[in-house]
Every structure is written in structure tokens, then in C-alpha cells.
Curated annotation (Swiss-Prot):
This is DNA protection during starvation protein. Pfam families: Ferritin. It comes from Pyrococcus furiosus (strain ATCC 43587 / DSM 3638 / JCM 8422 / Vc1). Homododecamer. The 12 identical subunits form a holow sphere unto which the mineral iron core of up to 300 Fe(3+) can be deposited. One of its GO terms (biological process) is intracellular iron ion homeostasis. Its EC number is 1.16.-.-. It catalyses: 2 Fe(2+) + H2O2 + 2 H(+) = 2 Fe(3+) + 2 H2O. GO terms for molecular function: DNA binding; ferric iron binding; ferroxidase activity; heme binding. SUPFAM superfamilies: Ferritin-like (SSF47240). Protects DNA from oxidative damage by sequestering intracellular Fe(2+) ion and storing it in the form of Fe(3+) oxyhydroxide mineral. One hydrogen peroxide oxidizes two Fe(2+) ions, which prevents hydroxyl radical production by the Fenton reaction. It efficiently oxidizes Fe(2+) in the presence of hydrogen peroxide and stores it.
């Protein structure tokens, strides 16, 4: 299957090695973001922190879902994840979402917003690269992009107090756009 699928994508003019690099870097970013959001969520304390903990949890679980949805496509195209977790983490297309030195709620929100803005850029690039050429990867990247834009809007609204128009939330980790790509659902 990977050889046939890969040839079909290559025939459209896509450099599959470049696409795999983009997808692996995106998967690494989602994986590391899940880890760092776990730490950030645990440091969202006090009354202000309790108010945003579930929102961080929602983004964290959806980012894990993004990782889980990207991995099958990587293998379908004949790629694979690195065997070494450290090597994999170093490939992430976005900076690590480290806990800030001063872990105030405002500083945590700034880290979260920066991470989501990077993710929006990553999936916009993948969508632009695959549009009209690789419908499966495009559909997947677009679904993830929808969720990353929502995450960005959530954190921007919480940080600035200005309405974002994107405060759709269901139960944490619901992934309304990406869930169709997850094999466990």
C-alpha cells in the first residue's frame, strides 16, 4: 500500500520526502506539545488557574489526537517515526512550550498562544503544499488546522479579554474535526 499511495502522490508533483519531513516535524511538535501542556496545566493554579485548566486540557488532548491522526498518514506514504524519542522531539516544527520562569497565568497563556500560533503556521504550510494534489493529507491537515485555530482563539481571548468568535468547546479532547481520522473512534 505505501508504494502505490506514494506513487499516486508523487504523480501530482509533490516531493513525498519533503511532505514526510513536514508531517514528521508536525507529529513531533504535537507529541512534545502534549507533554509540555501537561506541565503547564498542572501549574495553572489558584482561582485563575482553575478557570483555564480544562481549556488547557482540551487543547492538550486534541494535540495528542493530532499526533495519533498524523502517524498513520506518515506510514501510508512510506515514512516512519525515528526510533529514538530524543531524536524525534528534536525534530519538532515548533519551539518547546516550556513552563515560564515566572509561571503566572498570564505567562502560561502567552506560552500557550505562541505554541498555537506556530501550529497554525505549520498546518497552513502543509495545506498550501498539498492543496489540489494530495486530498488525503490536505483533508487531515485542514482538520487539524481548524482545531489549532480554535486553540489559538481560546488562548488569545483569555489573554487579551477580547472576543475571538471561536469559543466552541465540547468535552475535553473531543477533536470535532480530527476524530474522523482516529482509528479508535
Amino acid at each position: 500500500m505505501p508504494e502505490h499511495n506514494r506513487r499516486l502522490v508523487e504523480r501530482t508533483g509533490i516531493d513525498v520526502e519533503k511532505l514526510l519531513e513536514l508531517l514528521i516535524k508536525a507529529a513531533a511538535a504535537e507529541f512534545t506539545t502534549y507533554y509540555y501542556y501537561t506541565i503547564l496545566r498542572n501549574h495553572a493554579t489558584g482561582l485563575e488557574g482553575e478557570a483555564i485548566k480544562e481549556i488547557i486540557e482540551d487543547a492538550r488532548l486534541e494535540d495528542r489526537n493530532h499526533f495519533e491522526a498524523l502517524v498513520p498518514r506518515i506510514y501510508e506514504l512510506g515514512g516512519e517515526l525515528p526510533r529514538d524519542i530524543r531524536e524525534f522531539a528534536d525534530l519538532a516544527s515548533c519551539r518547546d512550550a516550556y513552563l515560564p520562569e515566572e509561571p503566572t497565568i498570564e505567562n502560561i497563556l502567552k506560552v500557550l498562544l505562541e505554541a498555537e500560533r506556530c501550529a497554525v503556521g505549520v498546518y497552513t504550510e502543509i495545506c498550501n503544499y498539498t492543496f489540489g494534489k494530495d486530498p488525503r493529507t490536505y483533508d487531515l491537515a485542514l482538520a487539524i488546522l481548524h482545531e489549532e485555530i480554535e486553540h489559538e482563539a481560546w488562548f488569545e481571548e483569555l489573554l487579551t479579554g477580547k472576543p475571538s468568535g471561536h469559543f466552541r468547546r465540547g468535552k475535553p479532547g473531543e477533536s470535532p474535526y480530527v476524530s474522523k481520522f482516529l482509528k479508535t473512534r
